[in-house]
């Protein structure tokens, strides 16, 4: 398993709303087309209205590379920049957890 923890900070509330719409559209495509994407969870951060946190878990690095190559993901990666003030990315190596099978 391979994962990402990503923290996005939007420029302002208008940008945050537009970013959320972009995320929703992209998420629909990920859900429909990516069996190797095990978890793609997006969260608002309590008390920090301009921040969004993504937790992404992929079957393996090949599934992540497939995800990154999709047209809708490439569009997301490009389009998101107009809404963001900052992006922080941590690459994760899975150790253990509830609800996730290592055989996935």
Please give the residue ranges for each predicted region.
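Short S/T/G/P-rich N-terminal loop/turn motif that feeds into the first structured element of a domain
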Residues: 1-52, 59-69, 85-104
């Amino acid at each position: 398993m391979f994962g990402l923890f990503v923290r996005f900070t939007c420029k302002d509330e208008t940008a945050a709303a537009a970013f959320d719409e972009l995320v929703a559209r992209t998420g629909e495509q990920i859900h429909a087309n990516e069996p190797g994407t095990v978890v793609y969870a997006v969260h608002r951060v309590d008390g920090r209205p301009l921040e969004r946190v993504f937790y992404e878990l992929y079957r393996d690095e090949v599934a992540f590379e497939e995800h990154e190559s999709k047209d809708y993901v490439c569009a997301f990666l490009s389009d998101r920049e107009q809404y963001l003030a900052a992006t922080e990315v941590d690459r994760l190596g899975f150790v253990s957890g509830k609800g996730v099978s290592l055989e996935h």
